Amino acid sequence: MFHKRKIDMIDFQILSILQKDATLPVKDIAKKVGLSNTPCWTRIQKLQELGVIKRKTAVLDPEKLGFNNRVFIFIRTNQHKKEWADKFKKYILNQRQVIGLYRISGTFDYLINVLAKDIGDFDQFYQNLIENIEIYDVSSSFVMEVMKENTEVPIQTLD
């Protein structure tokens, strides 16, 4: 939902450029979309104010930083009260190894995406999890090969 302001094609072009390289100077972005600097800068500011641009960040390579294991943890709970969900969410969000937390449909209730340096590092995470949070069932899958990973939103398909 885009709230108070309609996103136009120039905004989509700006967003596409920023997704690929958020370090580009405004003057370079403006040139690519056919605007002068000030209107381009204003559009970027508005997109940030609307929350369309959440933040500008660097994408790091986990393996080059020693995180050689990516693990998806599937959690099933038999506790569906707000108190349990709040405790679970607070605990998981405070774990530095967690790079994603999702409430999902299907057989499991939650999916956690974790980076671990090795099996021992993951086991420590797992042991702490089951010690601190009452969980009905847990299943973990280690990523064998990353075949595609992308942070870009496919905005060229948005209407």
Residue ranges and their predicted role:
Residues 1-159:
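A compositional/biophysical signature of low hydrophobicity enriched in polar/charged and small residues
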